[in-house]
Regions:
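Peripheral interaction segments used for macromolecular assembly
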Residues: 1-132
Length: 132
């Protein structure tokens, strides 16, 4: 929460006074790809930090019907889609979920970010081995 009792990080569907500015790419509707270049789902919404005035998460609608959050720092966006190098498309199904679809707790943020961070080191067997 921040001053006034409002939630700090919310989806754009709640923070209707925020939007993606031109000429930046609005990723809503674009496919989301894992490191294996397979499609995991598509971008449903963006979550904005209203205090910092920046996007924190991408809400991904998976092909299974579930919805997960993807930290912006683990994504690369271009006109063809959102690319994630830390996990495979199949591993999106195991991303920790939020209890609410309109807000995120600090603990949930930690778990979600840790999942993608751990994927950077452990998503593939070859990532777990020494380099030399």
């Amino acid at each position: 929460l921040y001053h006034g009792g409002e939630v700090k990080i919310v989806p754009l569907r709640i923070a209707s006074d925020h939007d993606v500015m031109s000429p930046d790419i609005d990723p809503r509707g674009l496919p989301v790809y894992g490191f294996d270049r397979y499609e995991a789902g598509h971008v449903k919404d963006l979550w904005v930090d209203r205090c910092e005035m920046m996007f924190r998460y991408i809400e991904v609608a998976l092909h299974s019907g579930d919805t997960v959050l993807l930290p912006m720092t683990f994504s690369r966006i271009n006109r063809r889609g959102v690319h994630v190098s830390s996990i495979l498309a199949s591993q999106f199904a195991n991303v920790p979920k939020t209890k609410s679809d309109t807000q995120i707790t600090l603990l949930e943020e930690e778990k979600i970010t840790a999942y993608y961070g751990a994927g950077t080191l452990y998503a593939l067997p070859e990532r777990q081995e020494p380099l030399f």
